[in-house]
Regions:
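Alpha-helical bundle regulatory/interaction domains
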Residues: 1-57, 61-73, 82-87, 102-127, ...
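Generic hydrophobic, amphipathic alpha-helix propensity
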Residues: 44-45, 92-97
Length: 151
């Protein structure tokens, strides 16, 4: 019920938001294609992925990621391409988009704006963010917020 919630409609809307957040987290930790999990994944790749996940909201360059992984940028680029089919920067963008999606689902409850979320997730250009978001999730960022706001 809505006993512990300040507003009954908020309780009704929280369920779907929390369910999708849990599914997103499970997908992210289940070792899907983005994680590149497997016995042959180089340590430098794993270190780079972890660094990106921890620091995704910060300004990052390829050199920063390579340094954290203990390899040269070209070596890291090749490892990402070979194991994930992505560049390190494309992987960073996907991690940031996943963070933004989670934040946008929560925005239905917190009232944060799309611009706030995009900026907090490391996107400098709102129109580029919106286009990338739509390409990845099939809906605009504002649609995600509305969908979870209305349940």
């Amino acid at each position: 019920g809505a006993a512990g919630w300040a507003h009954p409609r908020l309780a009704e809307r929280a369920g779907p938001v929390l369910a999708e957040l849990m599914l997103t987290a499970l997908d992210h930790s289940a070792g899907g294609r983005l994680d590149g999990a497997g016995p042959r994944r180089p340590k430098a790749l794993a270190d780079a992925q972890e660094f990106i996940k921890v620091h995704a909201r910060e300004p990052l360059r390829l050199g920063d990621i390579a340094e954290a992984a203990g390899v040269r940028p070209r070596t890291l680029h090749k490892a990402f391409q070979h194991h994930l089919g992505l560049t390190p920067i494309a992987y960073l963008k996907q991690v940031r988009l996943d963070l933004a999606r989670r934040d946008l689902m929560e925005a239905a409850l917190t009232g944060r704006t799309v611009t706030d979320v995009a900026t907090a997730c490391g996107f400098d250009h709102l129109s580029k963010f919106a286009g990338s978001y739509r390409a990845r999730y099939g809906e605009s960022p504002s649609r995600t917020v509305r969908r979870f706001r209305t349940g």
